[in-house]
């Protein structure tokens, strides 16, 4: 069964790899790619999405840029992780096509309205665009099957001691999304920190004789630099955003629990924290399926097998 998806991203190395993973599988039908500010400034994340789709020869997918800043706050970017371009490392082509002359919210609404089946939203950056869509198009809520997002943590954060980056950038947007009543799958740091790519995994990818695999290997080479800092305690580099796509393709790779999740929007110390009620202490109804465990080897195999799809037949088919 095919699933219609809209990818809302802020590329970003792991966003780019999530996009590459998704487009290798015909069961996932990409209706649109929209972008937000986050890993880099909004102009760079939009350009990066266009560059990746150009690399994949997928100029048929409509692309639109979204919000240039959070709902109520100043923008924070993660250029210390992703470099000056947001996709430092490989030599990527310049875009061969242009974005739509409408906003991300307008493109998402258009595609959801026209879709013949419910649509799954896959945001892998701050949730600003998704919040704006939900707030301005309540009539479309019934056509949104699920929101599969990368963000949050039941445990410690990675941008502050309490908060994961995507939620911290726009906690008010996250609050709207988690209160929407739409089914949510939360791929937070608890699971994405288990999705580490090791040096030997990168070499498996580099051994695949196609340009997309080579690009991913070079993305990972750069991504590893930041994550080698001993403070993280990582052996490899965590591939946060591809966990969303992996869950859509192979949910059996993950351990999950339905929980109530609230967003802290006020505290000076814990702003952006995702408060995950794992032990049902609040008595509130669960509003998210939270991922906690991962078969790492199965995850890596899925990525490697998916990259083998990008042979000349695929890349020249359009």
Curated annotation (Swiss-Prot):
Active site, renumbered: 240
InterPro entries membership: I/U_nuclsd_hydro_CS, Inosine/uridine_hydrolase_dom, IUNH, Pyrim_hydro_RihA, Ribo_hydro-like
Xref: PROSITE patterns: IUNH
One GO BP annotation of this record: pyrimidine nucleobase metabolic process
Domain of life: Bacteria
Broadest EC class assigned to this enzyme: hydrolase
GO cellular component: cytosol
GO terms assigned for molecular function: purine nucleosidase activity; uridine nucleosidase activity
Keyword Hydrolase recorded: yes
Its EC number(s): 3.2.-.-
Keywords: Glycosidase, Hydrolase
Function per UniProt: Hydrolyzes cytidine or uridine to ribose and cytosine or uracil, respectively.
Sequence similarity: Belongs to the IUNH family. RihA subfamily.
Cross-referenced NCBIfam families: PRK10443.1
Protein name in the entry: Pyrimidine-specific ribonucleoside hydrolase RihA
Natural source organism: Shewanella baltica (strain OS155 / ATCC BAA-1091)
Organism placement in taxonomy: Bacteria, Pseudomonadati, Pseudomonadota, Gammaproteobacteria, Alteromonadales
